[in-house]
Design a protein with these regions (language model features):
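PLP-dependent aminotransferase class I/II
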Residues: 14-226
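Glycine-rich phosphate-binding loop of ATP-grasp-fold ATP-dependent ligases
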Residues: 2, 6-11
Length: 226
C-alpha cells in the first residue's frame, strides 16, 4: 500500500512438503498450499495463518524502487492520503450510523494505510459485513476487518512456531511455563469485527475516486437507518 515494492527470493529444495512450509514462512505464515489466491482467501475466511511467518518477498530491484519512493513519502504519499482522509472526515462527521472515525492526537498521527469507520449498529439495520457487501455491489473497494483477533489463528492455537521446537511457544528457555491460547478472548476486539468498515485512500487515486466512495457510503448509510 505504501510503496510498489513487491515479491521475490528463492529457496531450492527436493522436499515438496518443506517447499510448502517455506512458501508459508515467507508470506506471514499463510496456508498457501490449500489456497494460492490469498486475496480471495482473506475475504472468504477470517483465520488463515497456519504457522508463524514473516514477510520475505522483496527483490533487490524492488527494494531500490521502495527506497526511492520513500524519498518523496512526506512530500507526495502521506499528504495525498491525509487530504483524502479529510474528505472522508468531513463527509462522515455527524452521520447517525457512524460511531467513530480515525483519530489523530499529539502523541499519534495516522498514516492512513486504511480508513477504518466504526459503525453505530444501534442506528443501522445492517452490520459491517452487510455494509461491505452493499459497497461491493456498487463496485466500490471495501473490506471489513481482514485480520481479526490473532489468538484465533491456527498458528497460535496449535502453537505452530519455528522448526520442530515450535519456538518460541514451546521453548523452555524462552517460556518455561508454556502458552495456551485456547481460553483467550478479547471482547472489545471481537466486537469491532461486526461494526468496522475499511475504506481505501491510495495516493494514486484522484479526488473523484474518493468522492465515489463517499457517495456510495452515504447512500448505503441513509438507506439503512433505523
Amino acid at each position: 500500500h505504501f510503496t510498489t515494492a513487491g515479491e521475490g527470493g528463492m529457496v531450492l529444495t527436493m522436499d515438496e512438503d518443506l517447499g510448502w512450509e517455506c512458501r508459508a514462512f515467507r508470506d506471514h505464515g499463510y496456508g498457501v498450499k490449500a489456497r494460492m489466491n490469498m486475496l480471495a482467501l482473506e475475504e472468504a475466511l477470517p483465520y488463515i495463518h497456519t504457522r508463524v511467518g514473516f514477510n520475505y518477498r522483496m527483490t533487490e530491484v524492488q527494494s531500490i524502487c521502495g527506497i526511492n519512493e520513500l524519498a518523496r513519502f512526506d512530500s507526495w504519499n502521506i499528504p495525498r492520503r491525509k487530504a483524502y482522509a479529510k474528505m472522508y472526515d468531513e463527509a462522515f462527521a455527524g452521520l447517525k450510523g457512524v460511531k467513530a472515525l480515525p483519530v489523530n492526537t499529539a502523541e499519534r498521527e495516522n498514516a492512513y494505510w486504511w480508513y477504518p469507520v466504526t459503525l453505530n449498529l444501534n442506528a443501522l439495520k445492517i452490520d459491517a459485513p452487510a455494509f461491505v457487501n452493499e459497497m461491493k455491489k456498487r463496485k466500490i473497494p471495501c473490506y471489513g476487518i481482514q485480520w481479526p483477533e490473532a489468538y484465533e489463528e491456527r498458528s497460535y492455537k496449535e502453537l505452530n512456531g519455528f522448526g520442530t521446537a515450535k519456538f518460541p511457544f514451546c521453548s523452555k528457555e524462552y517460556n518455561p511455563k508454556g502458552i495456551n491460547y485456547e481460553g483467550v478472548i478479547c471482547p472489545v476486539a471481537k466486537s469491532l469485527r461486526a461494526c468496522t468498515v475499511n475504506l481505501f485512500l491510495h495516493p494514486t487515486w484522484e479526488k473523484e475516486h474518493i468522492q465515489r466512495v463517499i457517495d456510495a457510503f452515504v447512500e448505503i448509510h441513509n438507506e439503512n437507518l433505523k
